[in-house]
A protein has these predicted regions:
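Active-site glycine-centered loops adjacent to acidic/histidine catalytic or metal-binding residues
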Residues: 2, 28, 199
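ATP-binding/phosphotransfer module of carbohydrate and carboxylate kinases, centering on a glycine-rich
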Residues: 9-19, 41, 56-214
Length: 214
């Protein structure tokens, strides 16, 4: 998937250069993940390893369209952030997002991020909810995989410090001793080029692994 390509790209050319144990998480319309262990892509039995977006973080939460309950994607994706604000605005909640909602019938994740930067209470609430859920998912990765680095990419990563400062604080506070001390959580450095660069790196690795007789 795109997150698998992204982790290869960031490892080869971006934030993860020289880091062989790392996780890439894309937070955009959905939430996905790619994992490197010992410098090699972790795919699992069916090629689906790393799906942080479908980790349950609230056993009493809403049902996602994937069929799971309370998974990270419900709360932390750009779609989930927007849906939370939409529901509150539909219920009459006061917010600087009101004009956009009344005009368009909905808001976007980017609208919410912009409003949060301006101190809007509803937008900050939606972002805090997103951070808590994402942190819970990342902590599962931290305690199972013990990575050196987590790179966050996708549209929501463009929220910058609004996302990264509280996210780091929660993860570092809750990580067990021996897991968080040397862990870095960083934004992507390759931006929208991450997928195509990752595809190139995947092809390079495939060629590397071909038998010399070919």
């Amino acid at each position: 998937n795109d997150a698998n390509l992204a982790v290869l790209a960031e490892h080869a050319y971006g934030a993860g250069k020289g880091v062989d144990n790392m996780v890439y998480v894309t937070v955009s319309t959905g939430v996905g993940g790619g994992v490197l262990v010992g410098g090699e892509l972790l795919l699992g039995a069916t090629g689906n390893a790393g799906e942080v977006g479908h980790m349950t973080v609230d056993v009493h939460g809403d049902r996602h369209n994937c069929g799971n309950i309370g998974c990270v994607e419900i709360y932390s994706s750009g779609t989930g952030i927007a849906h939370y604000a939409d529901a509150a605005l539909s219920g009459g909640r006061d917010s600087s997002l009101r004009d956009v909602f009344d005009e368009c019938g909905r808001v976007t994740g980017r609208n919410v991020v912009d409003a949060a930067r301006s101190g809007d209470d509803l937008a900050l609430e939606a972002m805090n909810r997103a951070v808590e859920a994402l942190a819970a998912g990342l902590l599962s990765f931290v305690h199972v995989l013990n990575p050196e680095l987590i790179v966050i990419g996708g549209g929501v990563a463009n929220a910058g410090d609004l996302l990264f400062e509280p996210l780091r604080a929660v993860v570092y506070e809750r990580a067990l001793p021996g897991f968080g001390e040397n862990l870095r959580i960083e934004p992507w450095t390759l931006g929208e080029n991450v997928g195509i660069l990752g595809a190139g790196e995947w092809a390079r690795r495939r060629l590397r692994d071909l038998p010399e007789s070919l």
